[in-house]
Amino acid sequence: MGTEENSSLEPQELWQQEYDKAHLRDVPFETMSGVPVDPVYGSEPYPGQYPFTRGLYPSMYRSRLWTMRMFAGFGTAEDTNLRFKELLRNGGTGLSTAFDMPTLMGRDSDSEWSLGEVGRAGVAIDTLADMEDLFADIDLSSVSTSMTINGPAATILAMYIAVAEQNEVTPNQLAGTIQNDILKEYQAQKEYIYPPRPSMRIITDMVKYTTAEMPKWHPVSISGYHIREAGSTAAQELAFTLANGFAYVEAAIAAGQNVDEFGRRLSFFFNSHSDFFEDCLLYTSPSPRDAHESRMPSSA
């Protein structure tokens, strides 16, 4: 859409052009009463256009539904592996990994600090062998994996890559997300290991690596959920989350990264609370704000 030919088109024409190129799901797009539903209603901005209030892609969920994955993890790696396979057999299209507290804090299961917490509310991962058991007989080239971990994120991602390579799956084939949002740990969840500056260095190194080697991977999931659960309002959740996101972008730019290369792989995780209209605003506000900030000279 950056050609001179496209620049002369109206927004609606641009959207229609891109929509017509999209591969749509082979299902009827209609209401339960059989009334056809148009691909878009109203005026500009259209889906897939700046500032992306109506979504990132011209065809949105008509092309592909969001990934269906249940948060899962308990006991040993073998226990969770069986659960993963059960979820995939019953319609799951991705995996979402919950780790136990010792793993989240970078501790071994046999540490005195881990007493009573091993395998509770998440799976225990101490070694590469555990990671091998966790994903045994699962084709990592065909499944998207989310891993909710922050302080030890670099170690866990390295283990995941090693397991994939043992099964002849290269890093550029891997799709998924690692939370890796350390700033919200200091603010809300408190599961951090290192001080802020070294932690930010690790994150920027991971952004650099995944941008170069793992084009299907999201290296940071910027999370407002934990901030809301710690007692914030919806507005505060949005404010802290966006501030954290801009901090990661600025740190990566300062380390020599190009925001146009890594920015599209940053994801967000917000809380779905009990106020319908507040949540509608919460989920639609970040896109135009991010789009505006990314066009500013300081972010280029």
Feature annotation, model-predicted:
Residues S294-A300:
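Hydrophobic alpha-helical segments, chiefly the membrane-spanning helices
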Residues Y283-P288:
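Conserved small/polar residues in nucleotide/adenosyl-binding loops
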Residues A291:
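Recognition helix of helix-turn-helix DNA-binding domains
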